From Swiss-Prot:
Gene3D superfamilies found in the cross-reference section: 3.30.70.930
Protein name: UPF0045 protein in glkA 3'region
InterPro entries: MTH1187/YkoF-like (IPR029756), Thiamine_BP (IPR002767), UPF0045_domain (IPR051614)
Pfam families recorded: Thiamine_BP
GO cellular component: cytosol
Entry similarity comment: Belongs to the UPF0045 family.
NCBIfam families: MTH1187 family thiamine-binding protein
Length: 107
């Protein structure tokens, strides 16, 4: 299972706020989650998405297109991929592994 850190930046909006575009992206992600393709987490600065890498590329393309569908002419999307293949860990398990070190030194 891979994890994608994605930031979709609509360019040329009518103001500094992009919340309405991000809300639309979250709605699209909810649809993919309902299909069982992904899990995701919204943060103040990005969205984390986990799933099969093939599905993640499909999802990233879909959310990249959303601002264009609303009439914008430019969108910048930043993507980071964590694709670990020796172990299968989801986002929550990765956080718990770090918390274990914080709480008891990893023992």
């Amino acid at each position: 299972m891979a994890i994608v850190d994605v930031v979709v930046i609509p360019v040329g909006t009518d103001g500094p706020s992009v919340s309405k575009y991000i809300a639309e992206i979250q709605t699209k992600l909810k649809e993919y989650k309902a299909q069982g393709k992904i899990d995701y987490q919204l943060t103040p600065m990005n969205t984390l998405i986990e799933g099969d890498l093939k599905d993640l590329f499909e999802v990233v393309q879909a959310i990249h297109e959303l601002p264009f569908d609303k009439g914008l002419s430019r969108v910048c999307t930043n993507i980071r991929i964590d694709d670990r293949r020796d172990k299968s860990r989801n986002m929550n398990e990765k956080v718990k592994a770090v918390e274990k070190y914080l709480n008891d030194g990893g023992n």
